[in-house]
């Protein structure tokens, strides 16, 4: 969408996302969702297999991945900040119980409360992975996907709040929601910094959780969301004359 110029002549960008019942109930809405930043890494251990009777002839990929995982758990940033690093895949070895695997694969899910913190976290993670070479193995890695954190326009959020007030009233309008989740919506403001963007948080009595296989929500919220966005756009047009 961005590369094809779909937002080149846009001043504002308004999005919407349902929120779980722990955050918002039906007929409640938040003036913005402050998503965190996220990154996903795939890593590989390169080596030669060895026989179980001759472990000195190879480097055990399982040991290397274990060392990396321990190193990741010893990354400490500012305690006031929200961040996390989790190993989500670890594969090494095969069906033969007497073979020490020289090759392995691992994946990481990395999250931080903002883009600056994510960049700092990425550097620390890369240092941990590269340090594993001290065991004598070769490692490689690639960041396969990055989702930027929210860059919310205060002006856009003010208009969103006015739209919520028109539909739900003061008592059903909440302030910003901060979440460790991420969303592709925020690529727009990274690629086009002049865009004034904000995402509406919409209550739907959604449970047990977002993206859960048995997720359920009250579908009546959909038209509420449409009306809030309509009122928000009308407020912008009124302001611009």
Per-region residue spans from a language model:
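Metal-dependent amide/peptide-bond hydrolase catalytic core
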Residues: 63-241
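Histidine/acidic-residue-rich, glycine-tolerant segments that coordinate divalent metal ions
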Residues: 1-84, 94-99
């Amino acid at each position: 969408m961005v590369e094809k110029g779909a937002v080149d002549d846009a001043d504002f960008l308004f999005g919407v996302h349902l929120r779980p019942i722990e955050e918002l109930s039906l007929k409640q809405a938040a003036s913005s969702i402050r998503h965190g930043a996220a990154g996903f890494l795939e890593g590989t251990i390169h080596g030669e297999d060895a026989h179980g009777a001759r472990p000195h002839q190879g480097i055990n990929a399982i040991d290397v991945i274990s060392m990396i995982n321990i190193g990741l758990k010893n990354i400490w940033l500012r305690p006031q900040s929200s961040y996390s690093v989790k190993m989500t895949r670890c594969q090494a070895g095969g069906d033969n119980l007497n073979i020490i695997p020289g090759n392995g694969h691992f994946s990481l899910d990395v999250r931080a409360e903002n883009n600056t913190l994510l960049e700092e976290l990425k550097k620390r993670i890369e240092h941990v992975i590269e340090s594993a070479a001290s065991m004598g193995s070769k490692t490689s890695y690639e960041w396969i996907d990055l989702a930027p954190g929210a860059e919310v326009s205060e002006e856009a959020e003010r208009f969103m709040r006015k739209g919520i007030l028109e539909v739900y009233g003061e008592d059903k309008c909440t302030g910003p929601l901060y979440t460790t989740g991420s969303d592709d919506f925020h690529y727009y403001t990274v690629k086009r910094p002049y865009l004034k963007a904000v995402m509406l948080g919409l209550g739907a009595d959604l449970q047990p959780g977002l993206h859960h296989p048995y997720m359920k929500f009250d579908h009546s919220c959909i038209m509420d969301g449409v009306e809030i966005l309509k009122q928000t756009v009308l407020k912008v047009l009124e302001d611009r004359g």
